[in-house]
Amino acid sequence: MAKMNMIAALNSALEHQLERDENVVIFGEDVGYFGGVFRVTAGLQNKFGAHRVFDSPLAEGGIAAIAMGMGLNGLRPVAEIQFADYIFPAYDQ
């Protein structure tokens, strides 16, 4: 197994899941074109398309609610909240 840092390992794991399951979608603030604030999703939108890796509005409560709705409807969402301090507004969901 190749040695890699944490960012590369997360990117590889997400890529693997997107390849093996067409119901996996990734979304969050700047995760699409930009590749996330820490570049964890870099290149995934180019490889899998904007319908599976896409940006969300700056609304953590909305991100959580959308992820729950996707899950209830058979998708396997990976919702990214940029920083731990931003998760608190999502607790209302």
Language model features: what each stretch is:
Residues 1-93:
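Thiamine diphosphate
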